[in-house]
Regions:
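Membrane-interface helix-loop junctions and terminal tails of multi-pass membrane proteins
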Residues: 1-249
């Protein structure tokens, strides 16, 4: 039991670091970096680099999921138990809240903008000269998040599959994959692919009256879970019957 709590604590710490550091870069870069492109690249790199850092820090303890969607995929692939899945998710949500709180403190108690996800202008419609979010925008955002999470999670499953390699470079592959989906998705949804990372800032931002992220939270929770489940199922199908490869001479 003691060893299990070490895993849960590692997940809590890892998710706190992800939320504080990566969302922190997104918020700060938005204020000091000139031009949308600079912010876009800085934010994408921040999320990817945090994953690399955490993968090689806590990966040997908990597997470094730091994302309920990843934990769901691992549950479906029978890499973790249902009990571990439940405690992982709790730890991840708590960690994300802690990370968001630390970020808010660094911003002098400003809870209004902590990196919560929102449907972006590319998916909005123009009504009377104004960009607005309609039903199509919401479901398009849901579809985008499913695809982004599918790409991210299937990269995780492939790079950590011990049947094909030892996984020592998995952290780099996973970090680059998260950078990729951020580069692709920031203009559509702000890129979630992680329910915990989206829920925490949405809850805290709501305290200041900024409820947009919270009103769309069903997207940031359900879409990543759906994308992760799809990735786990598809990966299982395309690798079924594969045996562990022999080392090359």
């Amino acid at each position: 039991m003691k060893e299990n709590w070490k895993k849960y604590l590692a997940e809590c710490i890892g998710t706190a670091v992800l939320t504080f550091a990566a969302c922190g870069v997104a918020v700060v870069a938005g204020q000091i970096v000139e031009g949308q492109l600079g912010w876009w690249v800085a934010t994408s790199l921040a999320f990817g680099l945090v994953i690399v850092a955490m993968a090689y820090s806590i990966g040997n303890i908990s597997g470094c999921h730091i994302n309920p969607a990843v934990s769901l995929a691992m549950l479906i692939r029978k890499k973790i138990t249902l009990k571990d899945f439940c405690f992982y998710v709790i730890a991840q949500v708590v960690g994300a809240l802690v990370g968001s709180l630390f970020l808010a403190l660094c911003l002098r108690g400003n809870f209004s903008s902590l990196g919560g996800n929102e449907i972006q202008d590319l998916l909005k419609v123009t009504v009377d000269g104004e960009l607005k979010t309609d039903v199509w925008s919401l479901f398009a955002g849901f579809f985008v998040e499913v695809l982004l999470t599918f790409i991210f999670v299937i990269a995780i499953l492939g790079s950590t599959d011990e049947r094909y390699h030892d996984g020592k470079h998995a952290g780099i592959v996973i970090g680059l994959s998260l950078t990729l989906v951020h580069l692709l998705g920031l203009g559509f949804t702000g890129t979630s692919v992680n329910p915990a990372r989206s829920l925490a800032p949405a809850l805290l931002q709501a305290f200041t009256g900024n409820t947009t992220s919270l009103s769309q939270i069903w997207i940031w929770i359900l879409a990543p879970l759906a994308g992760a489940a799809l990735a786990a199922i598809v990966y299982g199908v395309i690798t079924k019957g594969k045996e562990k490869s022999e080392p090359q001479a």
